[in-house]
């Protein structure tokens, strides 16, 4: 929900408010996160990425992940030699998952170009450590959104960045 009337309408239809989301935009952060490295994701990473998504969300997003790997936008973050997170792309329209905030910071810091794709990247505002890190590294808040669901919802058990699409 991005508008007060939408929020009220969806709430009256039975949707549950789950999370305030901050759209962040600006020059991509170029910071090295100790102990983390990032590389382009490959087909051989799918099983590890799906396991991380299941650990954080209770389900995987295999279809989006496979499509992103084919498009060349997916990346994985490694702590040592172990995959500890991934992104389908650092845009408004792609999700990211990590076991820790440092995993997401490394992924966010791997962006290239002049800005993050679309209106920006989506950061759960209640993840104050990650939200403040983005602000302290020059990103600006451009839009406030509300994540709402109807039906089954698993409270995330790790670090994540949602997609506007799913």
Named regions from a protein language model:
Residues 39-166:
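Intrinsically disordered, low-complexity, positively biased terminal segments
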Residues 27-43:
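Conserved N-terminal entry element of GNAT/NAT acetyltransferase domains
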Residues 1-20, 126-143:
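Conserved active-site alpha-helix within GNAT-family acetyltransferase domains
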Residues 22-25:
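Long, charge-dense
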């Amino acid at each position: 929900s991005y508008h007060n009337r939408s929020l009220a309408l969806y709430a009256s239809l039975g949707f549950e408010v789950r999370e305030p989301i901050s759209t962040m935009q600006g020059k991509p952060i170029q910071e090295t996160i100790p102990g983390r490295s990032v590389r382009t994701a490959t087909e051989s990473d799918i099983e590890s990425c799906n396991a991380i998504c299941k650990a954080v969300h209770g389900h995987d997003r295999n279809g989006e992940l496979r499509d992103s790997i084919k498009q060349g936008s997916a990346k994985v973050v490694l702590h040592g030699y172990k995959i500890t997170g991934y992104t389908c792309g650092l845009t408004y329209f792609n999700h990211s998952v990590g076991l820790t905030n440092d995993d997401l910071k490394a992924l966010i810091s791997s962006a290239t170009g002049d800005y993050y794709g679309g209106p920006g990247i989506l950061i759960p505002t209640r993840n104050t450590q990650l939200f403040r890190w983005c602000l302290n590294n020059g990103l600006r808040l451009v839009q406030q959104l509300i994540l709402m669901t109807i039906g089954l919802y698993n409270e995330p058990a790790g670090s994540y960045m949602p997609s506007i699409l799913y």
